[in-house]
Amino acid sequence: QVMKAYGAELDLTPRALGMKGSMARAEEIAAQTPDAWIPSQFANPANPAVHRRTTVEEIARDFPEGLDYIVTGVGTGGHITACAEVLKERWPSLKVYAVEPTLSPVLSGGEHSPHPIQGIGPGFVPDVARPELFDGVIQVAPEDAMAYARRSAAEEGQLVGISTGASLAAVAQLRPEMPDGSRVLTFTYDSGERYLSVDALWSD
């Protein structure tokens, strides 16, 4: 609705085709449209490069004593890859864990299927991602992602989206392995206001 408000024409692809279907359709449209340009965020090396210059340096400033764990979802793969590339060199004991949906365990070697955790689990390993730098992959079920998104709002006053709930659920899964006093970072990707129409998210 936001894009339509700005005057965009929407070309919706079948949900069953997932992100790959959307990307293929975008390529078709670009081929038919003069001077069209696709950012290609899953493959564009500028994606992790910008995170190396910005996100990574912000984290380093905010955590001068370093971190023990970074737990975060994989959408395009840009920010987790940049964090792993740079921060693991600065803080050799840092462990970086990727988060993916149980319904799309591609990083774990499984098959993709449609899932409601928007923003992560695109159904393939992005070209810019470097999974060999990850210390592990944590799978999160949709109901757990939604439960932690609700908890974030009710207990912390932070209205977050489903993918953020997935990362919080992943931290909770990993918590028993973490020594007391560990410094842990995850990310809030977007506001829960975008998901107010998702009935399943707010019905516990």
Indicate where each model-derived feature is located:
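Glycine-rich ThDP/TPP pyrophosphate-binding loop and its adjacent helix/strand module
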Residues: 50, 54-94
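Glycine-rich phosphate/adenylate-binding loop
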Residues: 145-166, 179
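Phosphate-binding loop/pocket of nucleotide- and phosphate-handling active sites
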Residues: 123, 169-204
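Short glycine/serine/threonine-rich phosphate/pyrophosphate-binding segments
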Residues: 73-83, 163-171, 195
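Redox-cofactor binding/interface segments in oxidoreductases and associated redox assembly factors
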Residues: 72, 139, 161, 186
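Phosphate-handling active-site elements
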Residues: 89-98, 176-183
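Small/polar-residue-rich loop-to-helix segments that shape phosphate-bearing ligand pockets
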Residues: 1-69, 100-153
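Short beta-strand segments
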Residues: 40-42, 73-75, 98-100, 185-190
